[in-house]
Curated annotation (Swiss-Prot):
Keywords: Hydrolase. Gene3D superfamilies: Phosphoglycerate mutase-like (3.40.50.1240). This is Metal-independent phosphoserine phosphatase. Belongs to the phosphoglycerate mutase family. It comes from the Eukaryota. Pfam families: His_Phos_1. One of its GO terms (biological process) is L-serine biosynthetic process. Transmembrane segments: none annotated. The keyword Hydrolase applies. The keyword Hydrolase applies. One of its GO terms (molecular function) is L-phosphoserine phosphatase activity. The record marks 176 as: Transition state stabilizer.
Amino acid sequence: MGHEWIDAEREFKWSEDVKVESEVTEIVLVRHGETTWNAAGRIQGQIESDLNEVGLKQAVAIAERLGKEERPVAVYSSDLKRAKDTALMIAKTCFCPEVIEVPDLKERHVGSLQGLYWKEGAEKEPEAYSAFFSSQNDLEIPGGGESFDQLADRSMDALEQIAKKHKGERVIVVTHGGVLRAIYLRITQASSAGKLLNASVNVVHLRDQKWIIDSWSDVSHLSSVGFLQRGFDGDAKP
């Protein structure tokens, strides 16, 4: 059997004309630190709730972790206070001059469920509670709430705009459990996103116009601080 010879010079010249390493944009998605309402089991939605003592410690811990990694070119945040407070801590440690607020990164509006305790949602607002856990993605939650599709559309649009502005760069985005769940499900087309933990690190890459999950729900930096094991789970009723 004869050998197949390769023209090495031709092969080398061809490879020079091809970009072997695709440009990768890295977005580090962070869920805000624990709040008073998280700890109490209350449904926040778009209602403001402050970071509690544990949440403040979590913000410090995640800021210290990210400060030791590759420096981001920018820090973005939801315009809700719990996310902004977490983002400000990260920005300071990562030597970023400001936190850029993006309203479309805010938590899902969950209608008449907002302000209730999870344990009373099914009894006090059965229609809204059912809509929240429904697999019908275009179903809006009664009381002015958003459908899953509305949440996912604005969340992914915000992510796309950030990635477009920072091609080939690394940025940090601080947001919410519902937004993280929507992003995960849109990217993976999975049926469940599992638990979204406070102050978790979730990394996504955009390469060749395709989103890829690099790592998800990493809380290794919280070993000495602790976190709510139940997290946020929009797929399972409490």
